[in-house]
Amino acid sequence: MTATPSDDRKYRHQRERLVETLRERGIHDERVLSAVGAVARHAFVDPALRDRAYADEALPIGLNQTISQPFTVAYQTALLGVQPDDRILEVGTGSGFQAAVLCEMGARVYSIERHDDLLRRARSVLDGLGYDVRTRHGDGTRGWPAFAPYDGIVVTAGAPEIPAPLLHQLREPSGEDDGPGGRLVIPIGGREGQTMTRVRRTGSGPHDYEQEEFHSFRFVPLVDEDEGGG
């Protein structure tokens, strides 16, 4: 079940309060705030939880997965530095909420999810709301080479280390005056917690990357199918 115009009116003030909460928590990118505020988050959660849809909290979506806390979505999106028409790969479609936010920012979004049931559900909601997201069922640690290179890659699950295929699929800088190339935002660490990390591609060589670390978060684990994840 997707949102309706009457739903939008019902939840409008809750969305506005959520945006103010994110601003108070340190999200200052107005484009990101506008995008989060434009997405009908209640459409991505179970109907029984819709009264909590605009609280700044993660909510269960089944299969031991969650729809990310809005602050986390806004934080990662701000670090990614999304520009209109950027080609963005999302690893971990989940509910589809992050993909919708990226679409609101004008990105071309490609999203991978390893749980087929979640992907079908997210696909239905995204289509119902009119978001143009290309999706794929598969192992996100391998990226999606067919549509690479990407201006940005966002990983919505915690990883013990950065998957090399994702680095290789970042766009190279196009010239000396154009600054760094593609950006990867990924939480790195064990199951007990991760450090939000941003990697920028700075050249065409195997070591031409710059890495920055930011705040601590706690995500569900990113599973590599070669390691026996189920």
UniProtKB/Swiss-Prot annotation:
Catalyzes the methyl esterification of L-isoaspartyl residues in peptides and proteins that result from spontaneous decomposition of normal L-aspartyl and L-asparaginyl residues. It plays a role in the repair and/or degradation of damaged proteins. It comes from the Bacteria. The keyword Nucleus does not apply. Keywords: Cytoplasm, Methyltransferase, S-adenosyl-L-methionine, Transferase. The gene is pcm. One of its GO terms (biological process) is protein repair. It is found in: Cytoplasm. Belongs to the methyltransferase superfamily. L-isoaspartyl/D-aspartyl protein methyltransferase family. This is Protein-L-isoaspartate O-methyltransferase. Its EC number is 2.1.1.77. It catalyses: [protein]-L-isoaspartate + S-adenosyl-L-methionine = [protein]-L-isoaspartate alpha-methyl ester + S-adenosyl-L-homocysteine. The active site is at 68. GO terms for molecular function: protein-L-isoaspartate (D-aspartate) O-methyltransferase activity. The keyword rRNA processing does not apply. GO terms for cellular component: cytoplasm. Gene3D superfamilies: Vaccinia Virus protein VP39. It comes from Salinibacter ruber (strain DSM 13855 / M31).
